[in-house]
């Protein structure tokens, strides 16, 4: 829950000097990306901008305090300020901020700018007291903000020092409007206006000018002079002399003498106690100070000119001027040290009564009251956890003694979930085991169930499905239906275990159940996770269209619940890319993989390994080995600098092995095979993948017998588990094995079976990557004219893709082929009497394969003009005039030689 006063622009006070000269300068603020107002405390920055903001409706105001160094809190308030300015225009960004569904502040701002692009009018965002920000993460995010904000948005920053926002670049590009302390200092005329408003008896202009000069136009000093004059008519010159040359850091003594010592004791106590509140209203004041009518007291303090300012139009919220508030808090530490814990406790109770647990925790920590902190956490910790207030929770739990956690085991559970969210899996089990061992009395079944549900999640994350299954089932047996979150966790783990064990039908059913439970209780990340799992299961079963439709549901969920920046979004994009790749929609597959990498841009580079493997895979399917090698270099560097789950390693190894096959790199393949552990089983599609990698290398090395044993066993397991997509892949590897071993009839048999199964899976690229050997076999099958119609269309599509993408297509026109062609009894007489050179045959092969002139020049490493000469010569020899005629001529020659094209 956001504190309204932090989003309220300060109310324009009576008796303030209107700074016409500065307002005139600010009138052109919409022409700049940044308006920067900097000066030491007390120069009137906030007052000036509140005057300028008066009457502007499309303006958001965000007043900072020290707690805003938490990036999540900063994001929530900043987006709320934008929403205030736009009347709720940026709904997606607001939901993402509220639910902490973004990878970083920069990525959240990127989403914000997408929404603001449709905003039609100038817009302003004021951030006050930016000097309180010390977190470099926020500084970096705001630099991103300034680089990418839309042109119609102006950021207005108020700070006591020069902020780390990269302003030099903005200054050079004339996108920065600056107002500093010299400009903020009062002029003689403004000082006279100020005294005329504040003093009952006017002072002479010369005297006013001298006072202004004595304090160098410092507004706070002028206010203190006026305050002293009201309290003691003879104090004007004395105050001016004391304040001359003084700065904000040496004001304490002056404020004690001239302010605190000149008010009655009740007012002094009120000031000191109320200053502990970063913002205050009637109820807070009444509870903290004991005043019966807090609102009336605040208005009285305001009338006395004691540096109190209204924070909203309703006049409900107040705060002290930062300079004065800081001074009062310091004095409170000295003068009321024994009462401080009680004051903070009262503040915490009042904040709790108004529904602000985060502020209450701040005061409970300051009071050192572990019991109060414990009670707040017991009532509100899970709400804070679900809103990702993780830093605050961690700080709070550390402040509680271990005995207090033991006495309230749900706080132990909370601490364990915090560790789980930070991937500190081993610490989770250690913490829970220690708690169970040291806890006094029996744990009830519900708590046991919650502990076991969390342990089950840790076990599956840590690659221990057997232990995960045991714990999940025990949890489900003991957890009541009301403990929906832990039941969702345990059910999800159960479904994932079934998936790992190859029981896809049951796993699909359990994951559908998980989705329903998660949707019912708005646990959206588990709903998304269950949809991703369902899609993977359907893919493994060979139902790729159903997998596609499930992915569509997941993308809709992401859009509706604004989950775009969760890492799970990358997972969904990745499995969509895998499906698109299988269907030979390579450009779309690559786009999904790159979007996935963008989602993970703010995480460790190792997280991008799987998407990077997909980029390699797309390049391999296109036959672009140079690009594949470039991506592989980065992939292998990541592999060597991280620890990965076996599934990730298997996917990375797959593209490496295919690359070695395409390039004939037997040495690299053999080295990999020597050091790669062989999985103990092949009872799911993850393990099947790594065994296929091993078999592919064995085939490349000519070790056909062990490769055949592997593939036969894989198929046996896959058939028993109905892993139809794996059967399709295994058949293609068997085809390669039989073809290379000279077992042509076996090769044809399994190829036809693979083509038939592809009617269900839709596979294209899995055939294409096998290259020329696959092309030769498909030509022969098409020439036999025995394929059913659907398989025939698929074979033609695969052959077309091989011809389009793979760079060894012109091998049809190598020297041996040309010799056989010239000796063929049906060779056209024109070719026999006017034969093409070997280079011209190569060019014809590349024209037939769909290469442009520039691509042919690149392939043969000659100039484009040379290629044009070759083409002109071969056209003349073939008696053709156009490129398409040459393609048809080449096709006829290939058909004559027995190639079905």
From Swiss-Prot:
It holds the Pfam family GerE. Activated by ATP and maltotriose, which are both required for DNA binding. InterPro entries: P-loop_NTPase (IPR027417), Sig_transdc_resp-reg_C-effctor (IPR016032), TPR-like_helical_dom_sf (IPR011990), TPR_MalT (IPR041617), Tscrpt_reg_HTH_MalT (IPR023768), Tscrpt_reg_LuxR_C (IPR000792), WH-like_DNA-bd_sf (IPR036388). ATP binds at residues 39-46. One of its GO terms (molecular function) is ATP binding. Monomer in solution. Oligomerizes to an active state in the presence of the positive effectors ATP and maltotriose. NCBIfam families: PRK04841.1. This is HTH-type transcriptional regulator MalT. The lineage of its organism: Bacteria, Pseudomonadati, Pseudomonadota, Gammaproteobacteria, Enterobacterales.
